[in-house]
Structures are given as C-alpha cells and as structure tokens.
Amino acid sequence: MAGVGAGPLRAMGRQALLLLALCATGAQGLYFHIGETEKRCFIEEIPDETMVIGNYRTQMWDKQKEVFLPSTPGLGMHVEVKDPDGKVVLSRQYGSEGRFTFTSHTPGDHQICLHSNSTRMALFAGGKLRVHLDIQVGEHANNYPEIAAKDKLTELQLRARQLLDQVEQIQKEQDYQRYREERFRLTSESTNQRVLWWSIAQTVILILTGIWQMRHLKSFFEAKKLV
C-alpha cells in the first residue's frame, strides 16, 4: 500500500485500521490505495457534540497507461461511521467524489470505514483505486464565508463568531481530556485493586502450604518414630 498522510497509519489485516492522529482543532489530508471490495477504516478521536466533515475523491488505475485516471465516473464509495459503543452513526452510498458529515454524540474513538462498489464495475475488477481523503473536525469544519453570507455578518462579527467557536471547541477538548483522565483513573484503581487481592491470595496460599508441609513432616517423623 502506498499512501501519504499527516498522521501515523497502521494496517491491520485486510480490513486495515489506519490510526490517524488527527487533532480536533485541525484538518488532515492523505491518500491511500485499496483493492477490489477492500475496506479501509480509520480511527478518529472526537469529543462529544462535535461536527466532522470528510471530503474524498477517487482515482482509478489505468492498467494500459499505467496511470491513475483523473476521475472515475460510475464508481461509488460507501461510507460507514461507528461511535465508541459500536453504534452506526452514518451508513450511506456516495459517488466517486463526495462529502460526508456527522456529529459525534459520544466522546472517544470513532471508526470511519470506506469501501467501493467495485464489484459492479468490470473496469476496476482486480485493480486498485486511489482515494484522497480530507477530514475536518470541530470549528474547522465550519464554512465561515457561507455563514457570513447567510447571516449577513460583518468582518468583525465573523471574526467574533470564529473566536467563540474556537473557545467552544477548546472547552469540548478539555471536557474530553477530563473524561479520559477519569476513565484512566478508574482503570488504574481497578487494576491496583486486582493486584492487591492477587497478592493477598498468594500470601494466604503460601501460608496454608507452609502449614500443610509442617504438619505433613510432623506426621512423617512421628510415623518413623524420629520425634
């Protein structure tokens, strides 16, 4: 697989899980290659109540010219998004180029999966497809020129709106970090408690084993009339 990205990617088998270290205050772009019916999944760490916009564009490999075609008419892309609880947030079929949007309602790792409808297209059968993907999270997902035109905002009002959105996103990030810290604390406490009880159990077992050995040896020596 060839790819260019701004985050660490990790393939895991045929349905690769590509881990993107994407910050919720920014946007990242990359491209990756997939084969026929192959699915690629990305893990995106997102706070709750945060809008996410994904833009993608596909290019099909021309075996004769050995180049990627600039467009792939007739080829579709299916996008599926699952929240940290495994609940499907979005599942929809798009065209060869498109945009998908969703809003997170549960903080944590969201799984974003894409695969083509290549089985319907003989030209792509057995070939490969290049997918350009750009994911925008948080206030960067807002189209401020469109907002300004719709709400008839002045430049100063628009700037104030952007600052308010940035502050809101920072608050969401802080809430999410506190949520992660709380989960980590609970996990640590649970682990420490299990370790403590295991240590106590080992100590009790050693004591009981020692008592049993002493009584067994005493019985042995008494039977041999050594004591």
From Swiss-Prot:
Residues 147-176 form a coiled coil. Residues 39-137 form the GOLD domain. Glycans are attached at residue 117. Keywords: Coiled coil, Endoplasmic reticulum, Glycoprotein, Membrane, Protein transport, Signal, Transmembrane, Transmembrane helix, Transport. It comes from the Eukaryota. The chain crosses the membrane at residues 195-212. GO terms for cellular component: COPII-coated ER to Golgi transport vesicle; endoplasmic reticulum; endoplasmic reticulum membrane; endoplasmic reticulum-Golgi intermediate compartment; Golgi apparatus. The keyword DNA repair does not apply. Residues 30-194 are lumenal. A motif (COPII vesicle coat-binding) lies at residues 220-221. Residues 213-227 are cytoplasmic. Residues 1-29 form the signal peptide. Belongs to the EMP24/GP25L family. Involved in vesicular protein trafficking, mainly in the early secretory pathway. targeting. Involved in the maintenance of the Golgi apparatus. Appears to play a role in the biosynthesis of secreted cargo including processing. Involved in endoplasmic reticulum stress response. May play a role in the regulation of heat-shock response and apoptosis. This is Transmembrane emp24 domain-containing protein 4. It comes from Homo sapiens. The gene is TMED4.
